[in-house]
């Protein structure tokens, strides 16, 4: 009887050992899958964070006066101060949203001759903000404005100079256009 109990006990231990091995294999596989999933999520988050770095500032020109023109003209702020994410195109004067989000844009413009100076800020060719000044004293004057815009990926923002208006800029950056992503939506 003892021998039979010993045999049954050995079978039971062997069965338990087999079950334990299977359980360890399942736990190990599950842990590996979980770690792989977490690693994938971390990589995606790191990618998203790097995509969210968007900011630019650009001066208008070193050449002095810009305008007046016979018709409204898109201004090309070609003097890049900062262009993190390369979303501002200094050749076309247009910012293109690389991701959907809430963006902040600001601009300052100056002139020193008597007359009107001012700028429109456009989103997808629709005027959003206008800022102007009548420089009636003939010294340096400036105007500025800022706006928060909800943009979808691919939306475009630029500044336009109205017909018969003029601006001034030189190496001191009197006239500057800036924007940055506040947060991703």
What role is predicted for each listed range?
Residues 150-163:
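Noncatalytic modules at the cell exterior or secretory-pathway interfaces
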Residues 64-67, 83, 113-118, 162-165:
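Extracellular, disulfide-bonded carbohydrate-recognition/adhesion ectodomains
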Residues 163-185:
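C-terminal helix/juxtamembrane-tail motif
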Residues 83-120:
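Beta-rich globular "head" domains
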Residues 55, 116-118, 176:
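Exposed beta-strand and adjacent loop surfaces of beta-rich binding modules
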Residues 79-89, 133-140:
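Extracellular beta-rich ligand/substrate-recognition surface
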Residues 1-82, 86:
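Assembly "stalks" and propeptides
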Residues 109-153, 169, 185:
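Terminal beta-strand-rich extracellular "head" domains
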């Amino acid at each position: 009887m003892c021998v039979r109990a010993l045999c049954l006990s050995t079978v039971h231990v062997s069965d338990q050992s087999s079950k334990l091995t299977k359980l360890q294999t399942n736990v190990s596989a599950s842990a590996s899958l979980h770690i792989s999933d977490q690693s994938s999520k971390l990589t995606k988050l790191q990618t998203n964070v790097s995509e969210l770095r968007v900011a630019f500032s650009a001066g208008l020109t070193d050449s002095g006066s810009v305008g007046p023109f016979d018709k409204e003209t898109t201004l090309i702020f070609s003097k890049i101060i900062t262009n993190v994410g390369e979303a501002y195109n200094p050749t076309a004067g247009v910012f293109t949203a690389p991701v959907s989000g809430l963006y902040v844009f600001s601009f300052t413009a100056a002139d020193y001759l008597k007359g009107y100076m001012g700028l429109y800020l456009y989103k997808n060719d629709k005027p959003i903000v206008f800022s102007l000044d009548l420089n009636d004293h003939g010294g340096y004057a400036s105007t500025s404005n800022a706006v928060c815009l909800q943009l979808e990926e691919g939306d475009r923002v630029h500044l336009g100079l109205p017909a018969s208006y003029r601006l001034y800029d030189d190496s001191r950056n009197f006239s500057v256009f800036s924007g940055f992503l506040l947060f991703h939506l």
